[in-house]
């Protein structure tokens, strides 16, 4: 995977592949356990990738609006799932000879704002038809999708597509402040999207990888809207708790900020000015210095008892 992007070491110990020529840092994540043969859609695997992203953004000068997620074979399966679970983190998704399975089929609408470049071979065990459920939905709804199918080719890495990939990547950039978004989630760790965090999913929405699939489970739908004209953030969530994060590119901190949850206005302190402590904590935890949040609001929705309340009640019994 690393050499595919960067080329091999030359006698002087340098790599002069396409990534270096185009100004990219390439990170290869060791997310598999010993003897693991396939992607397992687990929290451990998500954390392996997201922790590396956080580590890199803290230690290097990274353009966080130009981060791409890619993988070959099982790594492509992982990239597809993690990309759709956290579409706000990436400028684009590049699954190669991969399968969109399990949660990808239920999270397909999360990719509305995520450019995807899918590469496969026509002789790779009907891979295009196996992914047709997801790909056809992307295409039908006008998502930013590129499919490169190589006729007469099978299960291989397709290094001859690399130059076209870099040309495609050069034209993509993440929009971290969309005016509207709608996503679905079924795992407790798929709980943050752009400027909204959620907590306590409805019981009939939670499906862990070991349980998948569960008949009757319905993904939790989260929709949000940024309305600068009236200095308002609006969300509709089925969860027990929601956290708004507010940055300087979103609203006017000199004016009162309005927060609406499920159609109801949330009472907020009069002082919604930037808070240095929140800013520093956000940069520390996310590592995104280009898109910092200056203020946040946490509120209960009343739909479900949060885990924190249950814990306090249990300790009091």
Predicted features along the sequence, with ranges:
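Active-site machinery of serine-nucleophile hydrolases
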Residues: 1-58
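Short alpha-helix in the alpha/beta-hydrolase fold that links the catalytic acid
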Residues: 7-9, 127-137, 245-248
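Extracellular/periplasmic catalytic domains that process cell-envelope and extracellular macromolecules
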Residues: 17-22, 61-62, 85, 109-112, ...
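Stable alpha-helical elements in mature extracytoplasmic
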Residues: 45-52, 75-82, 86, 130-134, ...
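Primarily recognizes the serine-hydrolase "nucleophile elbow" in alpha/beta-hydrolase
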Residues: 65-112
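Short beta-strand/loop motif that positions the catalytic acidic residue
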Residues: 111, 117-120
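Acidic catalytic loop of the alpha/beta-hydrolase fold
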Residues: 122-128, 155
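Alpha/beta-hydrolase-fold serine-hydrolase catalytic core, especially in secreted/extracellular enzymes
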Residues: 140-146, 151-317
């Amino acid at each position: 995977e690393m050499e595919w992007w960067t080329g091999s070491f030359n006698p002087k110990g340098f790599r002069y592949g396409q990534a270096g020529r185009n100004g990219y840092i390439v990170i290869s994540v060791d997310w598999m356990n010993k003897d693991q043969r396939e992607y397992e859609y687990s929290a451990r695997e998500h954390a392996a990738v997201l922790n590396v992203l956080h580590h890199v953004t803290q230690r290097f000068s990274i353009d966080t609006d130009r981060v791409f997620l890619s993988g070959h074979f099982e790594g492509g399966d992982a990239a597809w799932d993690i990309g759709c679970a956290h579409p706000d983190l990436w400028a684009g998704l590049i699954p190669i000879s991969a399968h969109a399975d399990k949660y990808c089929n239920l999270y397909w609408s999360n990719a509305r704002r995520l450019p995807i470049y899918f590469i496969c071979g026509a002789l790779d065990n009907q891979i295009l038809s196996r992914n047709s459920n997801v790909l056809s939905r992307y295409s039908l709804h006008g998502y930013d999708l590129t499919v490169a199918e190589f006729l007469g080719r099978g299960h291989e890495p397709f290094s001859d597509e690399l130059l076209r990939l870099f040309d495609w990547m050069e034209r993509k950039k993440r929009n971290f402040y969309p005016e509207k978004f709608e996503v679905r989630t079924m795992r407790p760790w798929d709980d943050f999207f752009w400027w909204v965090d959620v907590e306590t999913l409805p019981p009939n929405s939670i499906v862990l990888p070991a349980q998948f699939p569960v008949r009757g489970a319905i993904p939790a739908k989260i929709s949000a809207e940024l309305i600068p004209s009236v200095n308002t953030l609006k969300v509709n969530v089925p969860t027990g708790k929601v956290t708004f994060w507010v940055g300087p590119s979103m609203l006017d901190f000199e004016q009162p900020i309005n927060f609406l949850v499920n159609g109801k206005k949330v009472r907020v302190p009069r002082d919604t000015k930037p808070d240095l402590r929140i800013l520093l904590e956000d940069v520390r935890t996310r590592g995104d210095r280009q898109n910092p949040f200056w203020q946040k609001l946490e509120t209960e929705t009343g739909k479900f008892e949060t885990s924190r309340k249950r814990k306090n009640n249990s300790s009091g019994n």
